[in-house]
Amino acid sequence: MHIDIDWQNVDTVLLDMDGTLLDLAFDNYFWQKLVPETYGAQQGISPQDAQEYIRQQYHAVQHTLNWYCLDYWSERLGLDICAMTTAQGPRAVLRDDTVPFLNALKASGKRRILLTNAHPHNLAVKLEHTGLASHLDLLLSTHTFGYPKEDQRLWRAVTEETGISAEKTLFIDDSEPILNAAARFGIRYCLGVTNPDSGLAEKHYTRHPSLNDYRRLIPSLM
């Protein structure tokens, strides 16, 4: 799908964090490998049983705020998820195209707002290890509002909090259900990321334009 952004009529760019500005390899390793392994060892069950149990637990709360909540998973699984996140902090890395794109947005006068479903502790750890905050104008965790990006109430709350105009906003995310929610609210430009995890094959979007390198946007932006 062709990317057609009228940059003259965009004043705000909302950006997801994990998979969009940061390599999703961190989260995929943490939630798909480390958590099941740690839980299985603690419970004395096989890796296969641990994987299946964790998969069921994830599926039960998918697209809700609990899915992203470290406190919820600590209580649910009996693991210190916050401490585990802190220990894995050095694994968090920026995408190669993140800083050039954010710098270009700044140079062209666009407001750069992080909008992440990440738990505040998760966000703080990643900011510490990546320096991402210095390239953004505002950082928002949806936990502050009580709703994830999949929920229309979140979009209303963010609009009230930031004063953004949906008609003049570009939103970039690596989740099609979340892009759908943004489009439903009225965000004019919704753009998907095809390579959120540098170690996995690219993904495809059915309803939104997408790309694998933000540097492709810079010539039209400048």
Give residue ranges: language-model regions.
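Asp-based, Mg2+/Mn2+-dependent phosphohydrolase catalytic module
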Residues: M1-V13, N103, H119-P120, A124-M222
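N-terminal helical cap/lid subdomain that shapes the substrate entry/recognition surface
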Residues: I3-P100, H119-H121
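Ser/Thr-centric signal marking residues that sit
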Residues: T20, T116, T169
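Small/polar loops that bind or transfer phosphate-bearing groups
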Residues: D23, L114-L115, D173-D174
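Residue-level marker of regulatory loop/turn positions in helix-turn-helix DNA-binding domains and
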Residues: L94, L115, Y147
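Catalytic-core regions built around general acid/base machinery
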Residues: D97-G109
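Short active-site oxyanion
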Residues: G109-I113, A166-T169
